[in-house]
Amino acid sequence: MTLKDIPFWRVLLIFQTARVYAGFGDPREAITMIHQQHGKPCDCAGGYVNAAPTVYLAAVSCSSHTAYQPSDSLKWRCVSNPTLANGENIGNCPCKTFKESVHSSCYTAYQECFFGNKTYYTAILASNRAPTIGTSNVPTVLGNTHNLLSAGCTGNVGQPICWNPKAPVHISDGGGPQDKAREIAVQKRLEEIHKSLFPELRYHPLALPKARGKEKIDAQTFNLLTATYSLLNKSNPNLANECWLCLPSGNPIPLAIPSNDSFLGSNLSCPIIPPLLVQPLEFMNLINASCFYSPFQNNSFDVDVGLVEFANCSTTLNISHSLCAPNSSVFVCGNNKAYTYLPSNWTGTCVLATLLPDIDIVPGDAPVPVPAIDHYLHRARRAVQFIPLLVGLGITTAVSTGTAGLGYSITQYTKLSRQLISDVQAISSTIQDLQDQVDSLAEVVLQNRRGLDLLTAEQGGICLALQEKCCFYANKSGIVRDKIKRLQEDLEKRRKEIIDNPFWTGLHGLLPYLLPLLGPLFCLLLLITFGPLIFNKIITFVKQQIDAIQAKPIQVHYHRLEQEDNGGVYLRVS
């Protein structure tokens, strides 16, 4: 049978047939919706809580806090890490026994103390917690050397507890001071290796960002934005037609997605950077996750990078030598720290990942809160809906099927990852400089009583400040540098028109503040003017009704009873 022999209506029916998924819709769209609504781990969409959840699926360190994904919710909940209390040294330790490690969820603040010429940590115990084996609070089978031992805390609640400042190998205190000390030790060791390999000491942007003027954007930041937009334009041109690319202020935490690159680079030309904090995503959804494991030798030369607690390692490769990540990838290890190089004496568990910048997208047709006359009318501003970069690129629907499922060439993602590895710290300083300008402008805003949300500089606008993010406008031609400047000019034009209008400048500039009160005042005036008249009308009407009821005669209807004389005999007694 040929195509000509098939009736036309059958061919039309075949092309009109839609794909169904057992009546539940496309599961990839559900994954995209979950990421868009619940955000990234460090966004803390589930809010901050006082204690870590009893059972959680994954934990991600976010510098000042730790994000947990509980089993009863898809939103990440965050717990602030303990801080060093005021008066960091209290002298002699108030304890007679000292523990090896104490989990950070068991106290809120800690101090240093001394005992026997040694330094220890001490805190007031707030709760008890049993130590666990595994990647979460759910214990796994003992004997698995790849599992992470999470420290516990036992004692009398409300009493002081003391412990060593250095934790044993492969034991985590949940982002507390012991984990911080481990990270500092690893960073110092990598810096020593870097100095031995490069005696002339070439400063990496991660270690020393370039100096630049406060009013100018750094070249690395602009190049990263351009590369991100180019990738977005090729993978999702409809979204990239007109949009805002928003970078968070402060220290950026790049996104880490699984990488299937099995080729490891040569150690001779391996770039060495300090540990980089990242946000691992999609590792829990990955079916076949390959991990690298190096056992510890139980000596002082071990470089403990920790064990991953955000991935299900289905395959574990035992490593006994140094490792160099491919040019566009990193090793993500314990406390979600990323490394490009692992020395020969490293110990822990790591996964290979590709980095993407922590950029959110605002569609061009979405209203952004640019201040204008709305400020004077005191209109409530609508919240800006940000689209995560992974959703915009379509990565959330493809990672679970492997890199072959990515819509665009994987080489483009690796190029962006390679550039991000080199420039992330320079970008951090740039956005921090811009945030400093926003903070300094806040005082001007309060003094001039104007809602100035646009970031201004001597040479023109840089970015639009939206919810602690620095947003850059882009269209078909790429990143538009003068977009904010044009918005500022339009805004200034509107303000001049308002200032020149005597209606707004009356009463020595107090009229804009009196306008919100005009409505209630007008209603009150109407009530005072017409209120008594309406009240008298109501009283008169009620009185008339009562008088009418009282004046109306009461009619009683009755019938006269009939009398019958039967002519009976009566006995009369005298």
Swiss-Prot record:
Disulfide bonds join 243-246, 243-471, 463-470. The keyword Acetylation does not apply. GO terms for cellular component: host cell plasma membrane; membrane; viral envelope; virion membrane. A motif (CX6CC) lies at residues 463-471. Residues 23-514 are extracellular. The record marks 382-383, 556-557 as: Cleavage. The surface protein (SU) attaches the virus to the host cell by binding to its receptor. This interaction triggers the refolding of the transmembrane protein (TM) and is thought to activate its fusogenic potential by unmasking its fusion peptide. Fusion occurs at the host cell plasma membrane. This is Envelope glycoprotein. Residues 407-457, 467-503 form a coiled coil. A motif (YXXL motif) lies at residues 558-561. A motif (CXXC) lies at residues 243-246. Residues 446-462 are annotated as: Immunosuppression. The chain crosses the membrane at residues 515-535. Keywords: Cleavage on pair of basic residues, Coiled coil, Disulfide bond, Fusion of virus membrane with host cell membrane, Fusion of virus membrane with host membrane, Glycoprotein, Host cell membrane, Host membrane, Host-virus interaction, Membrane, Signal, Transmembrane, Transmembrane helix, Viral attachment to host cell, Viral envelope protein, Viral penetration into host cytoplasm, Virion, Virus entry into host cell. Glycans are attached at residues 117, 233, 260, 267, 288, 298, 312, 318, 327, 345, 475. Residues 536-574 are cytoplasmic. The YXXL motif is involved in determining the exact site of viral release at the surface of infected mononuclear cells and promotes endocytosis. Residues 386-406 are annotated as: Fusion peptide. The gene is env. Specific enzymatic cleavages in vivo yield mature proteins. Envelope glycoproteins are synthesized as an inactive precursor that is N-glycosylated and processed likely by host cell furin or by a furin-like protease in the Golgi to yield the mature SU and TM proteins. The cleavage site between SU and TM requires the minimal sequence [KR]-X-[KR]-R. The R-peptide is released from the C-terminus of the cytoplasmic tail of the TM protein upon particle formation as a result of proteolytic cleavage by the viral protease. Cleavage of this peptide is required for TM to become fusogenic. The CXXC motif is highly conserved across a broad range of retroviral envelope proteins. It is thought to participate in the formation of a labile disulfide bond possibly with the CX6CC motif present in the transmembrane protein. Isomerization of the intersubunit disulfide bond to an SU intrachain disulfide bond is thought to occur upon receptor recognition in order to allow membrane fusion. One of its GO terms (biological process) is virion attachment to host cell. The mature envelope protein (Env) consists of a trimer of SU-TM heterodimers attached by a labile interchain disulfide bond. Residues 1-22 form the signal peptide.
